[in-house]
Every structure is written in C-alpha cells, then in structure tokens.
Amino acid sequence: MALPLPPASNLHSILLVTKSRSLGPRLVFHYPPLSPSAAALAGAKDPAWYRHDVSTASIGSGSSDSEWDSSTATDDDNDVEIGSRTSGGRGSGRTLTGASFRDRDRSKLGTEVWNKQETIDEDDPDDEDGDRNGRNRRRGGDYDWDTVLGFKTDALEKMLSPGKEFNKRRFELGVESIVFVGAPMFVREDGLWKKLKRRKKKRSDKEKLDDADFVKNLTISEEDEEADTVDEIPVKSKPEPFVYPEGFEPGYGHGSISSGPSGAPSEAGSDARSNSTSQDNNPDMNMFNVVFVLNPPALEYQQRVKEMYDNVTRKYAKALKYEEARFQYVWKESKRIIDLKQRAKESNESLTSTWRKIISTSPLAKSIAIMFDAISHDKIAHIHFDATFNTSFQIPQADSTPYLPTALEPQMPGLWLTTSNVVLADDESPMTQHAALLLLEDTETLIKDLGGEVTGNAAAIAFYIRNIIPTKSLLKISKRHNISAHDMEYIASHLVYWRRARLIAPLSPRDTYIVSPNADFSLLPSAVTAYAQRFPTLPTLPKVLNMLSGTPRPFRNFIPTTEHREAYMDILAWLMRGGWVTQLRTFAWVRVTPEIKAKVAAEMEREERIKKAEEARKELLSDNESVAESLLSDKRSSLLSAGTVRSSTPLRMAHRDRGTGGLGEEDMHHSTILSPRITASAAPSYRGSPTRASSDAGSTSSQRTTIALSSSQRPDSPSRLGVRDVKPHRPSPLHLHPTSPSRGSAVSLASPTATSPPPSPKDFKPSIVYSPQKATSLEARWLEKIGQSFEDVGNIIPTPNPSPPKGQDGGMFGITGKELREAWPILLKHLDGRHAIEDVAPRENMKRKRVAAMYNTIKERGWLVVVRHW
C-alpha cells in the first residue's frame, strides 16, 4: 500500500490565455494579481505537510475549518472576500480582502521577488512613463502590467498557446522550477464548440428515394442548421458528462439539489447558441487555455501534476467549454476583462485595485479567484459561472493512513490512523454496505448546506441523512427504513467524496478503542472547549482520553450504566470524528503445529510407498507380459520348424502323433514349451547331441533353452502367469502383500514398513501460513488436516463451564467439531493478517458471538497467531 501524500496543491497562480483571429494570443487574466517569479518560488519551499488547517471546509460553503475551532472566523457569504490566512498556504496572492500581497509570503520571499521583476521591466521600450512606473515597481510591483511570474507577458502568451494537436489533451510545460499545466480547448471545424445533437425527422418514402447521396444527407449544412434551430429549442442541450454524480455537481449549499445544469439553463443556452452560430459560423476565438502554475517537489512531481490535471484543470476547462458552447461565455468575458485592463493601464491604476474591479464585474474572473483560493488552501471550490450553472471542484484527500509519521515520512497530524479495509478497491467483497457512515458535521448543519428541502430530492436526502447513525451499517439502515441499498451506497460515496462523512466499522461497545498515536494534541485546548459545550454533564475530554490510554479493554467497560450507553456512544463518535481515537482491531494467521506436520508427513510417506508399489506392480506385469509373448513366439517357431523339417520322416511323424494324440491342445502347448528345459536340466548335454534333435528348433530360436536355470531363476509357465494374483512370478520387495511365504519372509527385513518409524513431531517446527488463499500444496494439506482434526475438538478441549451463560466470553459456546469443520474454509479467507476478525461476522452474515467462539476455540488449540493493532 502506497504512503498517502499529505494534502498540498502547490498551486501558485492561474492564467487564462485565449487565441482569436482579431487579437491573436492574449493573456486575458491571471490570479493572484501579484505573483512571485519562478526563481523566487524555487528558493521558497513551503513545508506543506506541517499544516494544521486542512479540513472539510470549502470556499463558498460557509462552513468553518473544524468542529471545535470556535476562534476561526467563518467564511463570508461574499465569494470575493473569502479565504482566510493560514499558516500552510502557498506563496501566492491573497484574495482581494486587502490591497497588498499576502503578508506571510511577503516576509518569506522578501523584496528580491520584485527586484527581479524590476530589472526585467526597466528596459521596456513600450513603457511611456518609465520613471514613474519604475518608482511604482520599487514600491512593490503593483504597477507592473507587463510581467507575470517573472516572465514577459507576450512571451507567456506564445508559450501557453499550443497547436491544435493539444486539443483535449494535457498541456504540460516546465520552465525553471515551475510547471504550467493546462487543458487547451479548440473550436470545431464547423465553428461550433460542441457537436450538435440533431433530432431525426421522419421522412416520407418519396423523400428517401429522392436522396441520391446518403452520406451527403448526414452532413449538417448552414441551411439545415438554421432550419433545425426551431426544432432544437424544445430539446435540452445537456452538458458533457462530469465525473460527479448527477444532481451533486455543485456540492452543498449552492443549489446542487434544487437546480441542475440540465434543466432550464440548457434551454436558455440553446437559444443564445443558436443565434450566435446562425449569424457567424466561424467565431472570433478559436482556442482558450486555463493554465495552473505549480511548483511541486521533485519526488512528488508526477503525482501532484496528475492530481491537479485530473481533478481540477481538465474538469474546469470542460465546464468553460460547455458555457462557451451555450452563449460564448469565455469570449464575452475575455473581451470585458481586456477592456477593463486596458483602461486601467492607460489611467495608471494599480493592479490590486484593477483586479478588484474585474472580479466584481466579470463572473469568469471571479470564478478563477475562487478556484485559486480554494485549491491553494486544499479546500472545495464552489464555482458559479452564471445564474443558471454552478459546480464544484477539489483535489480528493486521503481520509486515513495506516502508517505512523516518521522524520523521513511525515504525516498530517490528526489524520485517522487505521488499517480498516472497508474501502479496499482490490477486495472481492467490499465493505461499503456493511460499513457505517460517520458524518463529519452535525446533521442539521449538513442538511442546511443542502439548500433546504425545496425539492423532492433534497427532502429524500435529508431523510437519509437524519437516519444515518454510526452504530448501524448502511445495510441495516436501508432495511429498517425501506431504503434501496444502492441509494444508500450512492449517497455514502458522495458524502465521502465531498469530505462530509467517513466510512468506518460500525461503532460497538464490545469493540476496543485506544487513543490514536497520530492524534493532533496541539488542538487539545480548543477541543476541550468544544467538548464541554457538547457534553457538559459527562466526564471531561482529558479524563476520557486518560481512560482510553490505559490497558485496552472493550468500550463497554467504561460505560457506568445502561442509561449512559447512548451518551457514551455519542462521545465515541465525536472522538472518532476528530481523529482522537481509533479502533484496536484483531488480525490472525494460521499456525501449523508440529503434530499436524507429523501427521501429514506420515500420510505422504504412506502414499509414496503405495505409489511406488503400484509402479513396481505395473512394471512387473509389463515384464511378465513380455516374457509370455517371447515364450509364445518360441513355441510358434518350434512348431513351425518341426512341421517343415521333420515331415519327410514317417517314423518321427508317427512318434509326434503318438506323443500328442492323448493330450489336449492346452497340454500340448505346455509340454511343447517345457520339454526343452526339462531335457536341459535332467542330463548334461552338448551342442549337436542326437538326444536333443527334437529341441533343435527351440535351441536356435531362444537362448533361454540352452542355459540351465535354478529354481529361483526359472520363469513361470504361461498357465501360471494367467493366475498372477495367486502366485506372482517375482514379487517386489515394496509390495504390500507378498504372496510367496518364502520370499516374503526374505525381503521383509528390507521393507520400509518394517524399518522406517513414523515421523515424530520432534522432527518438525511450527510455521505460519501467511496467505491461505495462495497456499502451496504442502500448506494446503496442513490446512486440510487442521480442519479434519475438528471432529474431536469437543472431546479434547476441556471447558470449565460446559454450558456457559449467554454472553459469556471463552469456552466452547456450544460449538461442535462439525460446525468448526464446515466453517473452516470460510474462516480461512480472513486469516491472512490483512482482514480483521471483527469484519468476519458482517461479511459472512454470521453471528458475532459464534465467530468469536470459533476463533477462541481454534486459538486454544494453538492454531492461531493473533496480533492487535489499528
């Protein structure tokens, strides 16, 4: 799991660049009005991770930075006068609440920022009032109209106006220590900023036949566009799809529920757009680029740039393109801003005063100012483009971390410390529906931010929020109040994304909670005051934290009576909301004991012996079959030779007839094969002896008939081979059941069954199976053997109380070996050290007490290694 980066946008400025046929590339607007140079930014690194003001607050929402920070002034309703001074803000201009640059950045960057700009602009030949403007620049650079970020304005205009190949692509330009990130938007070839969605007309068959070129009819000409304008008026022009869910685009408190961008504003936009496009199909402006200037650390460069582009730059550019397609919003506002700047420059007005006029006059400039103040403070920006369309932007932040802060890897103090897997993306069964939703704001405050209950959607969402409690899972709440589970998950994901809630395991008095090691105790004084106002009759915050700092115990041990349970659970929810406490969770791995390993080893040895014996038996049968085939071949050769060579001698023919006349076919078969061997063993002979005339064929056809064989080496006859199960020809020493008594006794001393003792547990050491789902073949056999040993678990484990009372911990809880064996495969999925045992019950739809009893039983047998952490 990657270490989550602390929230730090590293945003220093926002620039708006347009390109038109009449004016060419122009730097229309930049915010803040006074920006330090790139060289000054390179030497002024801000430890953004050490900030304490990052919260769920947002610019324009009117919410405070934290629940207990009563001293922090709330944001003004006026979007122009927003953005309070914070200790962790970036080096950029303050919102126009004053006439000077941000005091903190002025003291940090010093006068060398403006001295660099002064030296650049002193030689400007176009400055008619050089001496006067030079004196003004020495006063603070408030009259420097031709320099932005230490660069000449005309140079920036050319650099930030890319070609059309960058249309809808990320524009990234690094200069010195800063990077320009933008999403250029270009006009279409047909002069439109957005493709029209024509409504198909029903044509008669005659019109279809008159159409000679079908492809030509698919092209929208100017005449067709004007004719279809009337038909397009009832059709609502929908914006390009945003990532935010429908109905939630603007965020809270900005008409997100009562009005949406797909309603009436689309109709008005269609009128304005159709009028403009009908008059001039080629608009003057053909490109605009909103550029965000960043100065990220070198090791965080890729991630910071990607976060800014994906979440803010690209989405903001798409929103502006949508407004431009409706009624040329960007170009009209750009011409207004350029006109105001030109007049102020001619009258020698300061930048701050001019920017104040521009922001109060132009909605586009105001939206850029709000965007900068919110994103640079790591808050949510609520942007009002006009009276009919508004939306919200933010860089999502991590709501928790599994790691403790170190000197080399610092974390934001107060961040929720947990390894809870309720939001694991790679989990097969996510915990969303089984998790509880902890609201980070009061219920009524959150509902008020929704803008009231003026519509059905707002009323429904207000009903959902009022019924959300941190002690019940989303699944239980949906069942109790007859709410769709999909709707509950949808609302939960939305609240979590916009920093209004957090997914946690349902709070329970049976769980254990400890003081978080990542708690920010610098906020303790203000937290004590807020806690006392909320819980005046209950123990103080220091006392509660002191109780939870001792030996970990279930939270129910701190509740004095049943009547205090609800109040103490509210205290626990308040502490979880502020990151003061975290849940102590239980994780386990399977421990394989030496006894289990010895049993598995004995089984594997026995299986190996059986396997070898089976292989030997198959090899023996194969050899016997080959011997039989060889003997049958010898017999055929003998008969064939006897019939051809001796047929000319009547005496031999008669003798052969007499010898075989009283025998059956099978007896003749046996006697013919055995006769050469009997002759060879009965008396000594030599090659060419007359007494062996009848066996010459056998001698020449087989080498076996000329060698005297002992009784132990003599092969069996084919008749005996047919009864192989009764008397095998050559029993293997590895055979389990030797049929020959004499040989069986002879080889029994060398048999492994007699000499190899069974494996002893002393020969093995215990080990841990770290991932049962990815276990090896040997580990799988160990796990299977553990499951088989559950049969006698009730007889082996003694329990002091065979029938413990309901709710008592320990003992068997009535768990039988059969139940354990059936539940063993289910429990194994959670014994990998990553899934908490507390999550098994909701995930597998099991009773919590039964799960605890099973784990206690397995733990008593020594088959678990248990650890507890957050």
Curated annotation (Swiss-Prot):
Record-linked InterPro entries: HTH_NPRL3, Npr3
Function, in words: Mediates inactivation of the TORC1 complex in response to amino acid starvation. Required for meiotic nuclear division.
Gene Ontology CC annotation, any one: GATOR1 complex
Homology family: Belongs to the NPR3 family.
Keywords recorded for this protein, A-Z: Meiosis, Signal
GO biological process terms held by the UniProt record: cellular response to amino acid starvation; meiotic cell cycle; negative regulation of TORC1 signaling; positive regulation of autophagy
Biased composition (Polar residues): 273-283, 691-716
Region (Disordered): 56-139, 253-283, 642-768
Cystine residue pairs: none
Keyword Signal: yes
Skewed-composition ranges (Low complexity): 56-73, 255-272, 733-754
UniProt feature, compositional bias: Acidic residues: 120-130
Protein's recorded name: Nitrogen permease regulator 3
